[in-house]
């Protein structure tokens, strides 16, 4: 099985969990996309993708529409995408992606969480080559789909891997090919269920159950922060 497939299996256990945390994070992504490219999803590919991902997490239509409207409000602060790299106990490494309207606050909060749990922030770029950045798409397997034919049709758009599990097709490519692969799927009238940019560790490590629990606690605290969007690790 390919790495995108393995990533998806692991992501079934993702910790975002509570809707009270999840929907505001998704709302930020929608608002930023609408603010940058306009409020019409048909004319704004990034917004279209953000809405698809929100719907995949069962975010109510009213919440999605409210997030789009916030983009045109004069009271809505500009959002900034920032990332942090960190090392934690047991050889764990973190790539922390955030979206914030106050970078000073976010830096302080993330650093405080890391320090309290025996982890430390690293210089930007320290882990850049420890993670591959991939675009991952999911869509339903239809009766008339032939995966081998589909693979051949999508190679020119940058396709690297294609897998299927339980009626869901997972495809991946280098993050730079996100737009071309997304467009190819849309041109083929394939309805995308999810589309995300992910960071995959080039050399994943294995931990004991107790070590895993230690790292999970740190990740939970990081993801409790309203500005933290995703935490990627090098844990297998």
UniProtKB/Swiss-Prot annotation:
Which biological processes are named by the entry's GO terms? regulation of DNA-templated transcription
The UniProt keyword set, sorted, is: Cytoplasm, DNA-binding, Transcription, Transcription regulation
Domain of life where this protein originates: Bacteria
Q: Does the keyword Translocase apply?
A: no
Instruction: Tell me where in or outside the cell this protein is found.
Output: Cytoplasm
Give the chief site where it resides.
cytoplasm
Q: Name one GO cellular component term.
A: cytosol
Named from the GO MF annotations, one term is: DNA binding
**NCBIfam families assigned:** PRK12378.1, YebC/PmpR family DNA-binding transcriptional regulator
Query: Which HAMAP family does the annotation name?
Result: Transcrip_reg_TACO1 (MF_00693)
Which protein family is named in the record?
A: Belongs to the TACO1 family.
The name of this protein is Probable transcriptional regulatory protein Suden_1389
Lineage from the top down?
Answer: Bacteria, Pseudomonadati, Campylobacterota, Epsilonproteobacteria, Campylobacterales
């Amino acid at each position: 099985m390919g790495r995108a497939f393995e990533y998806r299996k692991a992501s079934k256990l993702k910790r975002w969990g509570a809707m009270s945390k999840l929907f505001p994070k998704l709302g930020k992504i929608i608002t930023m996309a609408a603010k940058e490219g306009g409020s019409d999803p048909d004319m704004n590919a990034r917004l279209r993708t953000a809405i698809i991902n929100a719907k995949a997490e069962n975010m109510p239509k009213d919440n999605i529409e409210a997030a789009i409207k916030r983009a045109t409000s004069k009271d809505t602060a500009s959002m900034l995408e920032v990332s942090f790299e960190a090392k934690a106990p047991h050889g764990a490494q973190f790539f922390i992606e955030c979206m914030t309207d106050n970078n000073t606050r976010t830096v302080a909060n993330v650093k405080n969480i890391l320090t309290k749990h025996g982890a430390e922030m690293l210089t930007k770029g320290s882990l850049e080559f420890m993670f591959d950045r991939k675009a991952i798409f999911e869509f339903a397997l239809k009766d008339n789909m032939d995966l081998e034919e589909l693979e051949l049709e999508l190679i020119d758009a940058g396709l690297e891997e294609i897998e299927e599990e339980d009626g869901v097709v997972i495809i991946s490519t280098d993050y730079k090919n996100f737009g071309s692969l997304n467009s190819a799927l849309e041109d083929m009238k394939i309805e995308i269920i999810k589309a995300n940019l992910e960071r995959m560790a080039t050399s994943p490590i294995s931990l004991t159950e107790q070590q895993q629990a230690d790292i999970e606690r740190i990740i939970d605290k990081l993801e409790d922060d309203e500005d933290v969007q995703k935490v990627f690790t090098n844990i297998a």
